[in-house]
Amino acid sequence: MKKRMGIVAAVATAMLCSSFAFAAPIKIGLMAPITGAFASEGQDMQKICELMTEELNKAGGINGNKVQLVIEDDGSTPRSAATAASRLVAADVCAAIGTYGSAVTEASQDIYDEAGIVQIGTGSTSIRLTAKGMKRFFRTCPRDDEQGRVAQSTLAKFGFKKIAI
């Protein structure tokens, strides 16, 4: 459910792309681990985004413009991520969603930022990612330090004294 909400937020954010009058479809990039260590997550992201794109287009698109989902496989590696990000920039997407894994996301951040493209990470928790201060980078999950703080607070609230991971 959390993953789906993140994807919903990402697609909604991509509506920023619709502030201009487009004759062509609005291109939204999905950079996801279709292969590699996180393939199951990436394949789920792909299915969700394809379904949402279909539903958006059936409802008339965004401001009357059809949405085109452009998919690139980041292979779950930073090197592949840089290539995938460059391909999405070349495809002229207005936003890139779905980057999963902090190292993969970080490898693509500068590429998207320099191109002026909004990037929405859906499974990237490293503090470094937002510490850079990139104005077009967003994420749908909490940072590592926030997860620890909330976990500690929740465990204390329920009176747990010892935990095991």
Where are these regions (language model features)?
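Short, well-structured alpha-helical segments in soluble
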Residues: 70-71, 75-94, 153-157
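Signal peptide-proximal N-terminal region
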Residues: 46-69
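Extracytoplasmic ligand/sensor domains, especially the bilobed periplasmic-binding protein
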Residues: 90-165
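Short, well-ordered beta-strand elements
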Residues: 25-33, 67-71, 161-163
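Sec/Tat signal peptide C-region and signal peptidase I cleavage site
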Residues: 17-23
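Bacterial N-terminal signal peptides that target proteins for export
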Residues: 1-9
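Cleavable N-terminal signal peptides
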Residues: 10-11, 21
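Extracytoplasmic "Venus flytrap"
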Residues: 29-48, 72-79, 100-103
